[in-house]
A protein has these predicted regions:
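Short, well-ordered secondary-structure "scaffold" segments embedded in the functional core
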Residues: 22-46, 54-252
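Short, amphipathic alpha-helical "recognition" segments used to contact nucleic acids or chromatin
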Residues: 2-16
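Residue-level marker of regulatory loop/turn positions in helix-turn-helix DNA-binding domains and
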Residues: 1-2, 196
């Protein structure tokens, strides 16, 4: 297969979840040829990073924090789960992929968008048992925010505690001080603050929804070892589409 055909096969596989067998029939080649082609192109797409302008791409979390600090934009983070096949029977780590949230075999990725919902970064995946806040710490987000430029990052209650570790740069929903028998004035204030935070943070949910429109992330039926490249390749392609749409909108 020439490079254009290999690229096209990879894009169709990622966008529509078409199996290697079907792609082999379409291109008139052996299934192993398609598998090898996708295995070669997918890492190349993943290495491109997320496009924020025609000449600027963000490839690491440090670059994202620097970009937000330089532009003064708001950042939003959230974790998302992607269903995967259950590990084979007898494996000692078989249960670590079971999500405590959905009770399904899954891996987690941390998604980073700006205040407008534009995709800036999608992290490598972790097993479904890994908590969102643990994943953020493992990625070095706490140190990057504590030592980096002053930025504001919105997050949900799963990241409660990062605010104190980053000097207040991670903003989570207001903590409820009354467990029960709260005064009416407090209930109204807490609900108002919670809704205000949620209405700002919803943009990252939209970004995740756009990611999940790619069938390869609806449920991953391939090898889990390829998940990191798959997630980051799709994030890069989606961010490039968002940037192109934004440029076109400005020209019209």
């Amino acid at each position: 297969m020439v490079f254009v055909d290999r690229l096209l096969a990879t894009l169709v596989h990622l966008r529509h979840g078409v199996t290697h067998d079907v792609l082999a029939c379409w291109f008139g080649v052996d299934r192993s040829t398609v598998t090898r082609a996708i295995g070669e192109v997918r890492p190349l797409l993943a290495e491109r990073g997320c496009t924020i302008s025609p000449d600027v791409r963000l490839r690491t979390l440090a670059e994202v924090v620097d970009h937000l600090g330089a532009t003064g934009k708001l950042g939003i983070i959230d974790g998302t789960e992607i269903r995967v096949r259950r590990p084979a029977a007898g494996r000692k780590d078989r249960d670590k992929f079971i999500s405590g949230k959905n009770k399904q075999n899954a891996v987690k990725a941390m998604v980073f968008t700006d205040g407008d919902g534009r995709l800036l970064f999608c992290s490598p995946t972790r097993p479904g048992t890994c908590a969102d806040i643990t994943h953020a710490r493992e990625l070095g987000l706490v140190k990057l925010l504590a030592d980096g430029p002053p930025v504001e990052i919105l997050a949900d209650a799963g990241y409660q505690g990062l605010g104190a570790q980053t000097g207040g740069r991670v903003v989570t929903p207001p903590h409820r001080k009354f467990k029960k028998n709260a005064p009416d004035w407090y209930e109204e204030m807490h609900e108002r603050q919670r809704k205000a935070h949620s209405s700002r943070r919803i943009r990252v949910e939209h970004g995740i929804a756009h990611l999940k429109n790619w069938r390869a992330l609806t449920r991953h039926l391939g090898r889990r070892e390829h998940m990191d490249d798959t997630v980051q390749a799709i994030a890069g392609l989606l961010s490039q589409q968002q940037t192109a749409d934004l440029i076109l909108a400005r020209q019209t």
